Amino acid sequence: MNLLSQFMKPKNKFSIENLRYLHNTLKKNQIITAQNKNLIVESLRQIAEVMIWGDQHDNLFFDFFLEKNIMGFFIQFLAQKTSTEVTIQLLQTLSILVENLRNENSIYFLLSNNYINEIIIHKFDFSSEEVLDYFVSLLKALSLKLDKSTVNFFFNHVEKDFPLYTEAIKFVNHKETMIRIAIRTLTLNIFKVENKEMREYIINSTAVPYFSNIVWFIRRNCMSLSKVLEKSNHDSSYQLKDYMDELTDQFYYLHDIFNLGFESMNIVLAEQFIQYLIYPVFIGSLIDPLKNPDLEDRITPTLALYLLAHVFNIFSFKPLLDTISSALLTATQSQAQLFTSATTAPPPLSTIASNRRHYNSFRRFSSFPNLESLEAMKNDGITSISDTDGRIGASGRLLNNTSTDEDSPPNSGFKPSNSVQSTSSSPSTPKKYQQQFSRLFGSSRKPLPTTPSSSPKPSTTSSITTSTTTTTPTTTITTTTTTTTTTITPSSSPSKQNLSSSIESTNSLNNNNNNNNNNTTANNDNLESTQPKEDNLPTITVLNLNSPNENSTKDDNNNNNNNNNNNNNNNNNNNNNTTPTPSTPTRKRFKFNRNEFKESLLHLIGSDRETFGIVIMLYSFLKNQHIDKRILEKGGMLPYRLALLEGLLSPETNNNNSNNNHHHHHHHHHHHSKTTVTSPNNQQQQQQVSHSTGGIKGQKNSKMSASLPINIGHNRSRSESHAKSLLFNPNLYDTVTLEERSLFKTPSPGSSSLFGELEIETNKTDEGGDEKDEYDDGDDESSVNIRIKSSKHNSINSSVDSTIDLSKNNNNNNNNNNNNENNNNDNNNENNNVNNNNNINNNNNEESEEEEFVPVPESSQKDFTRRLINALFMVLVNSNQFRLVTLQMTLLILKELVYSSDSSSKLTETQALLLEQAYITVTDNLKECLSGPLSEVFLEIFEEELRSYKQIIFESLMEDVSLILPIPQKPVSRLSLSHRLPSGELERTQKAVQQFLVLRELKFTLLRKKDTMLPLKQPPTPMVKEKYLFNLETGVVESSYDIIEYHHFEKVSGPTPPPPSGTPRKRFTHYGVLFHNLLLAVDPPPSISSSSSSSASTSGSGTPNSSIGGTGGGGGGGMGSGTGGTSSPNPSNIIGGTNNKGIYGTIVHIAPLQRLEIETSHRDPSILRVTSHPTTWNVEMVFDDSTQCSKAKQMLERVRDDVRATKMRQIYALLGEKDPDDDSVPPQLNYGNMVERNPTNSDHDSNTTLNNEHNLLSSNNNGEFSTSMSNTPPSRVITPIDTSNSHPLANILGSDDNISFVNNNNNNSNNNNTKKTTSTVNTPISTPHKLKKGNRGSSSNSSLNDSILPTLEDHLRKTVSPKVDMFNTSFFDDTLDLKELISTDELNNGNNNNNNEDNNENPFSNIKRNSNEVKVGQPVQQEIEKEKEKENIIGEDVEKETSIEQKEIKKDENDNNNIVEKEEEEIKDDNIKEEIKQDDSNNKEINNDNSTTNNKEDEEEEIKKDNKDEENIVNIEHINEKEVQEQQTEEQVEEIIKESVDIKVESDNN
């Protein structure tokens, strides 16, 4: 059976027998031929399936797999190289096994021998893409199984062989994207494994060639991206985006490597990244091509800035960022040489093999201190990085080339790796390596322990020469590139000190010695090209870790500084003797300027494209939290980090200490300045100096940063005296340069602070010294005053000078100043000046106490910072030339530079003027748009832009590479407005609004003010939602909202056939309620809707029944009609009883009044179309006649215009302008009294519960619902409330309230009318409307009949003096209080015209004055009697006047009714004419054969038409006659009023 089983395929696929069968198949077919090729492929595929099943179920499978050595057959098949199919299947089988094995023992079984390594190093034919894909997939699968134990299966620590890694990295730059991604994943998995021997192998053997090739590949991609950028446009930017995505992926891959914590490898990677990419490409491309002609790979400045922004945005490795930041802000000569030096491609990775011997040929670039030198420095007790041949490292530090390899040239940048592999390079060495690197780059300020020693030992690995003196040894460190000599003389008594303190003191010493050497070698022509002008954090520092007592060191140093100046030439000779010079000197390309990068930035600010690159680079640079803040301070990018500056810049401190500072500075500037170092003998003197130069109040020994200026205070310097002249100076950025003074910090022993006691360097600061050499042409004169290099100063515009003089405003008394808004209000209310001045002054006092902006002196900002901020403000001044995205990023970068959350913004006077000028510019632009062709829709544009305005998201901005493309001249559909310039009036208006919002935000932020005018204020409105119930019947309570009753035709939906001709369409009654600033579409109860649908006449007489469940009514509005209106109301749902006052309609839509579109239908003038924007709700309001339609249109348009005018007044006030449509100051709307009710008749107070806070429903039957109602009352009902003070029509409509009584209460007596009207005399009159139930016909049912009567308004305006407040009184009131009118008139005259008693416009002006005169000497009783007589006379006159007026009003009403009827007839005639024209056109097209009959009909119609025209002419004549009669009646009324007034005046005089 066993014999047969070997030849027969088992039925069970997952069994040992099947695995044995597959093994026998491979054994029989060990030589691949064309016949057995497919059989071998199938067998290999089945082996993978069986082994995976066995891994999860039975361990015997792997025992058999190892026993039969099946992996050996795999090696045999690979060695034949005859079939690609077998090779692919073999690699796939291995990948499946490695990926799916879960048992740890199975993985060990598979990897325990060297078969996997032999397969890895096999020479595959990678010309086949499938072979390469499966090979890389196998390598990636193996890397996923790596850990501390499994790595030993791949890495041979004896032979230093790691084939999995060395073979994989050859494909890191492959053209296939998926292969590159797989190799990145593999290398990251390998770097994660914490195996010391493996990491040592990687750092010593493959790190330099691997990382150099990666960075070179990124460099090639940058060049390709630059070429694509030049050819691309916004319509074809997809290829550009693909290149940028690939480049970003590469950056994130390097970022992931940095985050692994492989410290020594991170240093090598940073070194290659800087050497091949950052310095020569990114920074070198920003330097002027004339100064850098040898740069081969140059990209556009915009792309270089954009890529630098990505570097600062992605990377977080502190040493890397500190090195780049130092090179950008304070570049040394060595760094500048790397900016302009040409680099060659590194050796390819294809030369790397699995044999260890091949790795020795690679030489790593030794710009960083290598492991051997660190170990030597540890043994010698001296930490020193110096260069014996003057070569420069990639990071700008001096290189340590101690190689003894004779094959290496003197200036070679590579070092043989055999020195790195010495026994001193232990796995623990990289930590020391990183500590040394971090210390030199300023990444750590923690003190490190030092080893005490009596004297340093000489070392052969460093260029340190030791000389002895009689007392103490002196260690002299020489550097040929800087031509300076720094001598440190340690004391014999050892002591420990903080490393950070050593760095600070050494930096100060090096800076002072450099200054001294500059003075002694001023005649040297090559000085500026060889001498660094500023102490730089990454610059080489010479430290003695066995530091003895610091005090004696500093004393000796002070004594040796003078000898250093006199013996400088001798020291240089010694340097030449002890240090070999380079064999090939570097050719001088241009005059070295350490601020070359900063000058390039300032030069590029001007065009939109380059400015955008600068602002995103600076923002990414400043927002990176991993950059050492000291570098930013020294470079002028972070001048206000310490809160201590607030106390130093206070005017009080400056006034007390300015004279002392001046005297002290001249005392220390007699000769070449130098830093005085703290010692026990001069501690007291130092404290006095520190105290005299300023500090925090109440503290004698203030400790300050070196970045603080020495001119502390508010005295105006010479640069500030002409600050205004710089505003419109075309050479704004080059006219002023400052030589700043700063206070240097010197560490003191035992001090726990980061900074030592205060010391003064009176000649130069970190940047000031350089600026002196650069701008002042070597002038060495010492002066406290700030010097200016400017030969011409343009005068500032006088208008701006008078408008924006911030310095004067700071010293003026706030009690005498009023802001522009208050002044405008005072001009409109001249009579209230005395009363308002105190309030305005008090408000100004409160604002000034909260925050007062005080410009900082020019000296508080470094030259580069000041010029950069001024340039960015000039971008805002010329904001029309820049895109919105550039302006928004400029806003963010200015906030980073000058804004402080703890104190006022650090703006100089010039910068404050530029800010104000920019704000005035954008405000003027917006004013032009406000009066432009889009003025009618300006409010909508402004609100939409304000709604969409938001802060920019920097991360999303960095992902949009199209922003660095040339700005398109034509609009691009896929490009938003913020990313391009506007095209057309609409886009220009939108951009003007956005510009205004950006500048307003910046201004109020920097000045620390709260914007109280944005967003625009909305009038408070009670919350209303759809499906709420609205009380349409208010009973006897006089409400102040308007109701428009209209009809809506039933919509035919579905396959229902249209009704036969002549059949009237069903229509339903609906209501439009003008509720505050909203139009509510309300469905009435089914009873009203059904009754109105039966006919166009009125619903039944009496009080209609209303259903609480009104939601079943018609559809209402434009929502369609409901089915409830067509059926008879259900008696069970009807509220019975005669006392039922509530009629509840359902709100079906809420439309803002501001954006209503109102138009009359062209088909029927009695139909009004109302559309609500931005929603799609629309409705066709059908009225009984065209007159009602026109009145409804007039009302809606007037209300809409009032709502819009309210917001437009806010916009005008925002721009500092007066509304041109507002001739007088309107009464302010009182939005606070939202729940007040109009006074009502006392007879109905017991039947209403509107004042109850807990009952929002209008009650019936004394506050209770009838038993016929539903068990559950409505959950939410909107009860009409008094909105007379907030309704837009409150100030327009005068006496419609009384008209409603005239029209709808004919059956009532006049006494009842007078009782009702007297209760509303003193309240603003609106247009309350109830549901009309009269029997005057369908036209009288509509509330529109009582809405607006233009003729009556004109009549009232003519008959009554303008000084009488028509909105607070009513001439239809039978009990009009004339005395109240007279007193109100006189009061208004006193307030508005400065109590001018000679004003004759008001006929009642003399009445009150004469009536109040009291003759001296008359008894009081007689006066009282006369007053009573006067009152009686006045009362009689008033009654006569009111009766006359009522008669005239009735006549006017009749005339108006006649006019309305005539207008209806005219409209009908017009409709008939239009129908005739339409019929004519239709008849001509349809019936051409029946021309004779048509002509007859036309003749008849023409005859009818002529007849109607004649009738119309007669009607017009009647109308003219009536108009003449009306004018006569008006004149009569005026004469009567005048006569009555004269009578009253005479009676008063008598």
Swiss-Prot record:
Residues 538-551, 689-705, 1263-1274 have a biased composition (Polar residues). GO terms for cellular component: Golgi apparatus. Residues 382-588, 653-723, 744-859, 1086-1137, 1236-1283, 1301-1347, 1386-1513 are annotated as: Disordered. The keyword Aminoacyl-tRNA synthetase does not apply. It comes from the Eukaryota. It holds the Pfam family FPL. Residues 1423-1433, 1440-1454, 1469-1487, 1502-1511 have a biased composition (Basic and acidic residues). One of its GO terms (biological process) is autophagy. Residues 44-191 form the FPL domain. Residues 1109-1125 have a biased composition (Gly residues). Residues 415-436, 451-529, 558-585, 785-799, 809-845, 1088-1108, 1247-1262, 1302-1323, 1336-1347, 1388-1397 have a biased composition (Low complexity). Regulator of mitophagy. Belongs to the CLEC16A/gop-1 family. This is Protein CLEC16A homolog.
